[in-house]
């Protein structure tokens, strides 16, 4: 997705921050829905991914378990983390140490079917 006229301007990362990018087209579509559903919580999740994508785990932010704990992305296996943004809203992302980036691979106000 190339930015166009009237699109949001993404803030450039500073050296200590991680670059947050979409890893799938579905995540890019779901991001706007999630922002409309829970703007404040989605912003807090964005800031957390950007500043500390592997914080101490708690009830709303943790690495996924089992078969979902890792995901292949761009030919490499990366850890897969989840942030609970709302009752059902979720963000799944992959911290990429080599690129100092976070790849958002799922974002939606709906609960992911893979975890049901």
Language-model regions, residue ranges each:
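Basic, Lys/Arg-enriched alpha-helical interface segments
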Residues: 1-89, 95-116
